[in-house]
Amino acid sequence: MNITATVLLAFGMSMDAFAASIGKGAPLHKPKFSEALRTGLIFGAVETLTPLIGWGMGMLASRFVLEWNHWIAFVLLIFLGGRMIIEGFRGADDEDEEPRRRHGFWLLVTTAIATSLDAMAVGVGLAFLQVNIIATALAIGCATLIMSTLGMMVGRFIGSIIGKKAEILGGLVLIGIGVQILWTHFHG
């Protein structure tokens, strides 16, 4: 695979994480760049590991991974999105709550895993091609780091416009990503 294809693949794989990061950044009041970078690093690290895991599994269980990855991502994203919506409605009455909390490490890791299962499936496919899997995985991780950090910062501006309802919007974004993953699987 040439460098152009690798870069296109990397940024293509980072789009779900970008959208999820917008959703994560929206409910936070004025997140610092360090918070956005923390999110980007977590998403980037997970997105680097999943194609490597998928590549390793390619020889062992490619049929299972390809048959179930969309369902796993769908369930995780519906759960996380639903949780954000519920928290958004609970917090909607308390308009003076300042500042909004940071997202917990494990919540970010779970979201990153849910949005990177497609990268694991890509890793399975890459096992059957002549590619440098380390370079490809690092490219995917770096693109995801950049796009997730950017997504958090974009989400911050959306959140400042719509206020506390941003958590509901973020939950809807995650659910939308889950539905899109399932739709793409069944409708190509």
UniProtKB/Swiss-Prot annotation:
It is found in: Cell inner membrane. It is a multi-pass membrane protein. The chain crosses the membrane at residues 3-23, 66-86, 106-128, 143-163, 168-188. GO terms for cellular component: plasma membrane. Keywords: Cell inner membrane, Cell membrane, Ion transport, Manganese, Membrane, Transmembrane, Transmembrane helix, Transport. InterPro entries: Mntp/YtaF, Put_MntP. GO terms for molecular function: manganese ion transmembrane transporter activity. It comes from the Bacteria. Probably functions as a manganese efflux pump. Belongs to the MntP (TC 9.B.29) family. This is Probable manganese efflux pump MntP. The gene is mntP.
